[in-house]
Amino acid sequence: MNLVGSYAHHHHHHHHHHHPHPAHPMLHEPFLFGPASRCHQERPYFQSWLLSPADAAPDFPAGGPPPTTAVRAAAASYGPDARPGQSPGRLEALGGRLGRRKGSGPKKERRRTESINSAFAELRECIPNVPADTKLSKIKTLRLATSYIAYLMDVLAKDAQAGDPEAFKAELKKADGGRESKRKRELQQHEGFPPALGPGEKRD
């Protein structure tokens, strides 16, 4: 173009410190605004493609669907039923097997946990001198039960009379309990039987 050529020509003279051409001050203006005017002419095409894809969709090649069609298809596959609280049919079908497995897992785990807690509650009831308002952890319950079993075995070995539960001291910080006397009576009734079966009772 003449514009670029004239600019290069005058810029060459200016670089070598020749006396400036009278038209030189005007060259910067067409050089700066010339490309801008060309970009301004090309910009509407980019705007129509970037900012309004719905309008530009018919111009896409026939090899693939326009984006708007793909979006409509994706929306239709989930449909208006995809509200909170309602699963789309496709997702429900895909996650059905896993969902059933997950659903049965927590129920089974919950039953197992309830069974364990029930067994620990029964075990706590068997330990004497534990206040009714005392909450024992599972590990503490096991340790107290183990020590109580050891105590009972020791009682049998020593051939004690009726195995007085007062001799067993549950290692707790709280010493008093409302149901303590009831437990003592129950244990005294139960304790009357095991010593009779002990190995030291067989005497001639």
Curated annotation (Swiss-Prot):
Taxonomic lineage: Eukaryota, Metazoa, Chordata, Craniata, Vertebrata
Q: Name one GO biological process term.
A: heart development
Q: Which PROSITE patterns does the record associate with it?
A: BHLH
UniProt entry tagged with the keyword Phosphoprotein: yes
Q: Where is this region: Disordered?
A: 1-24, 57-115, 172-204
PTM sites of type Phosphothreonine: 113
- Keyword Nucleotide-binding listed: no
- State the UniProt keywords alphabetically: Activator, Developmental protein, DNA-binding, Nucleus, Phosphoprotein, Transcription, Transcription regulation
Locate the compositionally biased regions of type Basic residues: 8-22, 98-110
Q: Where in the cell is it found?
A: Nucleus, Nucleoplasm; Nucleus, Nucleolus
Point out residues bearing the modification Phosphoserine.
115
Under what name is this protein listed? Heart- and neural crest derivatives-expressed protein 1
Q: Principal localization?
A: nucleus
User: Could you state one GO cellular component term attached to this entry?
Assistant: nucleoplasm
**Its Gene Ontology molecular function terms?**
DNA-binding transcription factor activity, RNA polymerase II-specific; protein dimerization activity; RNA polymerase II transcription regulatory region sequence-specific DNA binding
Per the entry, what this protein does is:
Transcription factor that plays an essential role in both trophoblast giant cell differentiation and in cardiac morphogenesis. Binds the DNA sequence 5'-NRTCTG-3' (non-canonical E-box). Acts as a transcriptional repressor of SOX15. In the adult, could be required for ongoing expression of cardiac-specific genes.
Quaternary organization: Efficient DNA binding requires dimerization with another bHLH protein. Forms homodimers and heterodimers with TCF3 gene products E12 and E47, HAND2 and HEY1, HEY2 and HEYL (hairy-related transcription factors). Interacts with MDFIC. Interacts with SOX15; the interaction enhances HAND1-induced differentiation of trophoblast giant cells.
In its record, the post-translational modification comment is: Phosphorylation by PLK4 disrupts the interaction with MDFIC and leads to translocation into the nucleoplasm, allowing dimerization and transcription factor activity.
- The gene coding this protein: HAND1
bHLH domain residues = 100-152
